[in-house]
Amino acid sequence: MASFVDRVVLHVSGGTGGHGCVSVHREKFKPLGGPDGGNGGNGGDVILRVDHQTTTLLDYHHAPHRHATNGGPGMGDWRGGKNGETLVLPVPDGTVVKSKDGTVLADLVGEGTEYIAAAGGPGGLGNAALSSQKRRAPGFALLGIEGESSDIVLELKSIADIALVGFPSAGKSSLIAAMSAARPKIADYPFTTLIPNLGVVQAGDVRFTIADVPGLIEGASEGKGLGHNFLRHVERCAALVHVLDCGTLESDRDPLSDLSIIETELEKYAVDMSYAGQDGEVVPLNHRPRLVALNKVDLPDGKDMAEFVRPELESRGYRVFEVSATSHEGLRQLGFAMAEIVKAARDAVEAAPPKVTPTVLRPRAVNETGFRIRREEKAHEPLFRVLGDKPVRWVKQTDFTNEEAIGYLADRLARLGVETELFKMGAKPGDTVVIGEDDGVVFDWEPTMMAGAELLASPRGTDIRFADTGDRPTRSQKREEQQERRDAKAAARAELEAERKAGIWTESVSGRRAAQPIKESGLDSGDES
C-alpha cells in the first residue's frame, strides 16, 4: 500500500450560503412591528494551509472530495444565520496548486501559507434588510448562493537546498544516511528508493537540507522509469550533486557515460516557469551549480575507477570528490563544499531586491453597464443571452415560487438597463432570453410588462395593514378620546343619581306595589272554615 503520494486531483467545494428569512415582528402592544427576517449565514471556505507535520498527500488520495459546511438560514427577530465553518486542509511544505489545464494557481512555501481553494457562497438577505421607504413590508427574501466548486491538482515538490541525482543503485540513499540522520530504505537492487528522502546536514555554521531523488535513467525527461514523477522534486534545489557509481559491474556503464546521460536528461527537462528568479528567467537544471561525488571508492575497483575518470571530470569544470558511504571517506569535504554553495545561493537571494508585483488600478469605464448581451440562434429562432456578474447573481438569489421576488428581480434588471439593451439589439415580444451560461434561467421576454408590476395583485412592497395610515390617531388624541368617554360616563351616572334623589324611580315602584292585590294566607282561610 502506498505511503507517499506527491500528486493528487482534489475536488473542493465551498459551502452554500443560507437563505434569508421572511418574518414579521410580533410583540405585545406592537401590532405593526414590521419585517424582522434575518440574513442567511455565509458558506464556509476551503483553505489549503502549509503544515510541517504533513509530509505527504496520501489523505487526499484516499478522500479526494472535500466540502465545507453550509451557512445557516436567517431567523425572525433580526437573527442572522450561522456562518459555515472554514475547512482547513493541511498540505506539505512545497505544495504547488494547479488547475486542470496546468496553470499554476499557488506555490505554498513556508509554515502557515494559505490559499483559498474554494470560497463559500454568500448568504441571502432577509426581508428586514430589503425593506425601504418604498418597500415597507417585503414578502420575500433572497436565497443563498452556492459556493465555488473546482478540481485542482496538488503537486508536492520537495523543499531542499541540494539534490542528489544519479542512476539507480549509485549509492544516493547510502550517502544521505551517512551524512544526516535520515534512514531511507537501502538495498542492493535498482529503484529501491521510490520516494524522495530528505536529510538535514550541518557543516560548520551552515545548516542545509539535501534530497535523495529516486534513480534516473535514459529517457527520464520523457517520462521513462520514474521520469517526471520525481524530476520535479529537483526544481527547487539551488545545486545538484551527481552521484556516480565507481563500483558498477555492468559492462556498458561507467561514470563518464552515466554523467553524460544524466546531464542530457536534466537539459531536456523543462523547469516550471513559477520558479523564475528576480529577473523573470528560469535557471535550467543543467546550468545550476553542480558537484560530482565518485561513490564506492572503498572497493578496490572503485578506487581505481575514480582515479581514472577524475582528470576527465575536472577538465570539464566539475569539482570532484571521492567518497564512500560505507567508510565515510571524503564526506566531510563534500559536506563543506555543499555548504559553500548553499551559503552563496542564500546570500544572493538576500542581496537581490525584493520582487514587488505592481498594483494596477483599472477604473471602470464610464459606459460600462456591468453586463453584456450576446445574440445567438437556436432552432432558427433568436436567443438573447444576458451575461454579467450582477444579473447572474441576482437570478441565483431569486425564489421563483414567490411572485413578489420575481417582480423584484424584474425591477433590478430594468434599473440595470437590460430591457433597454434588448430593445436596441432588436428583441421582440416572445423572444427567448437566457440569463447566464448553459445553466442559466430561460424567460419569454414580454416588454409590455413594466418590470413585472402586473404580476402582483397589490402594490409590491406594501402591506394592507400599513395602507392609509395617515389618519391614524396619535397617543394624545387617544388619551383625549378616552377622557371624553370617561367624562360622558361620569355625567350619565350623575344624571341617574339626580333622578333617584328626585324620587322619580321611588314613586313608580311604590305605585306598582300598591296596585297589586293582597292575597290571604292559607291559615286565615282555614280558621274561617
Swiss-Prot record:
Its main location: cytoplasm. InterPro entries: G_OBG, GTP-bd, GTP-bd_Obg/CgtA, GTP-bd_prot_GTP1/OBG_C_sf, GTP1-OBG_CS, GTP1_OBG_dom, GTP1_OBG_dom_sf, OBG_GTPase. Mg(2+) binds at S173, T193. SUPFAM superfamilies: Obg GTP-binding protein C-terminal domain, Obg GTP-binding protein N-terminal domain, P-loop containing nucleoside triphosphate hydrolases. Its EC number is 3.6.5.-. Belongs to the TRAFAC class OBG-HflX-like GTPase superfamily. OBG GTPase family. Residues 461-529 are annotated as: Disordered. GTP binds at residues 166-173, 191-195, 212-215, 295-298, 324-326. The keyword 4Fe-4S does not apply. This is GTPase Obg. An essential GTPase which binds GTP, GDP and possibly (p)ppGpp with moderate affinity, with high nucleotide exchange rates and a fairly low GTP hydrolysis rate. Plays a role in control of the cell cycle, stress response, ribosome biogenesis and in those bacteria that undergo differentiation, in morphogenesis control. It holds the Pfam family MMR_HSR1. One of its GO terms (cellular component) is cytoplasm. GO terms for molecular function: GTP binding; GTPase activity; magnesium ion binding.
